[in-house]
Amino acid sequence: MIRFEELKKGADGLVPAIVQDQNTLQVLMLGYMDAEALAKTQETGLVTFWSRSQGKIWTKGETSGNYLHLVSLAVDCDKDTLLVRAIPDGPTCHTGSKTCWGDAVPESQGFIRELEAVVKGRHEQMPEK
């Protein structure tokens, strides 16, 4: 459990939270958390932020239905940024794009590419039956 009081906050009292897709490793969005958002995220398993534009707490997906389901949280070495690994229910961006960067951030294949290469190599080395 990450304790908000142990994190270094910006002048606004918030901590940036980078959200990454657990399965593809693609960076989905950047949000900001205050103590309440972090606590709610850890308690409910639904990623929650502080909306700087609306000045209130919001759970990603509460309007669209495209929730981000928390898998893990990590703190960087400076203790001033969070990495949120999540499984998205649908597009993350309010525009309908998978990420808040549109197509500018290519989908990572993570370990799948490596696994695919191993399987292909072993298949090629199999004796014929």
Predicted regions mapped to residue ranges:
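Flexible "arm" and connector segments at domain edges
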Residues: 1-129
